[in-house]
């Protein structure tokens, strides 16, 4: 059995490749000037192939970098918010963590998303049991101060509206134990996330990555003892 973690934003990846095909066809038929036609077509093809490469190979190694920077240790209680096919949750469980995961299972955000795909990947990787929940990041069914580490990868930007995104962050904060760590990996709105967390008493550190598609950042946030947040660059 092989792991299949799906294609991130599949309509975007194949959309880029389709646009590249249209530019190539338009150039061959003389509709588009050759220089601009081939150049633009090649650019869209590169974007589409990069998205596919990230989804199929790069993110498999990138997940370990996220977990390492998050300070994951065996026996930690970990929550993966927006787990999808289990990319981070399964890797965390393999490293000895007690993992729970939650998702609303959107096929638009991740191809083939669902519980069945999650379970197939967990079995393929030989990971121990993971508690799986259905639900939204803005309204999670967990008691306050439950987890040592809360992680979220390429999820929060998919939530529409600033207030709703902050509701999701507030929920992650709510279920985090005192002294716990919140790790948010995303492709945009990072200054909003950082500002919200620092205003709520977290010390943050931000990491940038240029091998992901799109380029991404990771915020590692820990509540400061005095409850006043700040940023460490």
Predicted regions and their residues:
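N-terminal auxiliary segments of SAM/dcSAM-dependent transferases
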Residues: 1-41, 52
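Conserved class I S-adenosyl-L-methionine
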Residues: 74-84, 100
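Conserved SAM-binding loop of SAM-dependent methyltransferases across substrates and taxa
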Residues: 85-96
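S-adenosyl-L-methionine
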Residues: 111-136
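A short acidic, Gly/Pro-enriched loop at the edge of an enzyme's catalytic core
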Residues: 135-150
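A short glycine-rich, Lys/Arg-flanked "PGG" loop and its adjoining helix->strand segment in the class I
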Residues: 165-178
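Conserved beta-strand signature within the Rossmann-like core of class I S-adenosyl-L-methionine
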Residues: 179-186
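Core SAM-dependent methyltransferase catalytic element
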Residues: 200-201, 205-233
């Amino acid at each position: 059995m092989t792991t299949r973690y799906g294609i991130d934003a599949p309509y975007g990846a194949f959309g880029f490749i389709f646009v590249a095909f249209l530019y190539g066809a338009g150039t061959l038929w003389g509709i588009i000037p050759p220089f601009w036609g081939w150049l633009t077509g090649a650019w869209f093809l590169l974007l589409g192939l990069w998205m596919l490469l990230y989804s199929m190979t790069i993110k498999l190694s990138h997940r370990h970098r996220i977990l390492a920077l998050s300070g994951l240790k065996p026996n930690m209680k970990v929550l993966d918010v927006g787990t999808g096919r289990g990319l981070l949750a399964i890797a965390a469980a393999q490293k000895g963590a007690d993992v729970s995961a939650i998702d609303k299972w959107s096929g638009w955000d991740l191809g083939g998303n669902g519980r069945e795909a999650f379970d197939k990947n967990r079995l393929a990787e030989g990971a121990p049991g993971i508690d799986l929940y259905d639900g939204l990041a803005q309204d999670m069914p967990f008691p306050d101060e439950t987890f040592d580490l809360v992680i979220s990868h390429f999820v929060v930007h998919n939530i529409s509206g600033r207030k709703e995104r902050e509701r999701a962050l507030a929920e992650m904060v709510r279920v985090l134990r005192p002294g716990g760590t919140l790790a948010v990996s995303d492709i945009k709105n990072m200054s909003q996330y950082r500002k919200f967390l620092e205003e709520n008493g977290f010390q943050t550190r931000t990491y940038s990555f240029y091998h992901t598609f799109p380029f991404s950042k990771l915020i590692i946030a820990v509540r400061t003892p005095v409850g006043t947040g700040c940023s460490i660059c």
